[in-house]
A protein has these predicted regions:
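Positively charged n-region of N-terminal signal peptides that target proteins for export
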Residues: 1-4, 73
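Intrinsically disordered, low-complexity repeat segments enriched in small/polar residues
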Residues: 5-6, 18, 23
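Bacterial N-terminal signal peptides
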Residues: 9-17
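Alpha-helical transmembrane segments of integral membrane proteins
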Residues: 6-7, 77
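Intrinsic low-complexity, intrinsically disordered segments enriched in polar/basic residues
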Residues: 2-3, 13-14, 142
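Ubiquitin-like/PB1-type beta-grasp interaction modules and other compact soluble beta-rich domains
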Residues: 21-249
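Residue-level detector of intrinsically disordered/flexible regions characterized by low predicted structural confidence
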Residues: 4-5, 47
Length: 249
């Protein structure tokens, strides 16, 4: 019985790391919005796998404790303590490391209000699909169906708090000559030269009433309240710039 149990436990410990490695193969994140590429596994994965292993060990104790000798019991209890300790230490170390190497030496909480207009129609982002989350986007960069960009967490570089990162986070894209926005009706795509009112249209992006170039690279101002946080307006229209209202609201 002792040998079977130890073989079973060894298989679990061998299979678990292998599954972690394969679960991260092929992952790509243009803006690295979840910091997963910095560490062997993400914090969420560490908690998930640690919880699974912890649960397996608890089940083993519940169903097999009467058949275990003292040495086996000590091994199982040691593994339970080790799993809990290692996960906790991993979370502490990665959190401290992220804060030390971050751009601001700690987490941020910035906001910017926005509107998106395509051919005189205001475009609303697709509502969150997850029952457990009200975020349109990811933890670091998202909206809450409130026309407000939320930057919440640790940023490592300016790129992670750019407008390009926001559009990437919500499942769209932004460039100097166009944008793509996921909506409840599907993906809305508009690029310079597409028609509005049967006339060639162009993308304009205004920040606090001022026209900007290369909007994907624009970094959101570091403020929690709006104003002084940015008020950003995306306008795709056939109208001349003189005919456009550059302000939101």
């Amino acid at each position: 019985m002792k040998k079977r149990f130890l073989v079973f436990l060894s298989l679990i410990l061998l299979i678990l790391p292998i599954s972690i490695v394969f679960s991260h193969e092929g992952e790509e994140n243009e803006f690295m919005l979840d910091h997963s590429e910095l560490y062997p596994i993400s914090q969420l994965s560490a908690v998930t796998y640690g919880s699974i292993l912890f649960g397996i060990l608890i089940v083993i104790i519940i169903f097999f404790h009467k058949r275990m000798n003292n040495l086996t019991k000590k091994i199982v209890y040691f593994l339970i303590a080790a799993v809990a300790s290692l996960v906790t230490i991993y979370l502490i170390i990665t959190t401290l490391h992220l804060n030390v190497i971050s751009l601001t030496k700690g987490p941020v909480h910035w906001h910017a209000d926005f509107e998106i207009w395509v051919c005189d129609e205001e475009i609303k982002l697709a509502k969150p699909k997850s029952f457990l989350s009200n975020k349109q986007g990811v933890n670091l960069m998202h909206a809450h169906d409130d026309n407000r960009i939320h930057v919440e967490g640790v940023i490592l570089n300016n790129k992670q708090s750019s407008l390009g990162a926001f559009f990437f986070a919500i499942g769209g894209s932004l460039s100097a000559d166009g944008l793509k926005i996921p909506t409840n009706e599907g993906l809305v795509s508009a690029h310079d030269g597409d028609l509005c009112s049967e006339k060639p249209a162009k993308l304009y992006v205004f920040v606090n009433g001022n026209l900007i170039d290369n909007p994907a690279f624009y970094v959101i101002s570091p403020y929690e309240k709006v104003p002084p946080g940015d008020r950003i307006k995306f306008v795709f229209t056939e109208k001349s710039i003189e005919e456009i209202n550059p302000n939101i609201g």
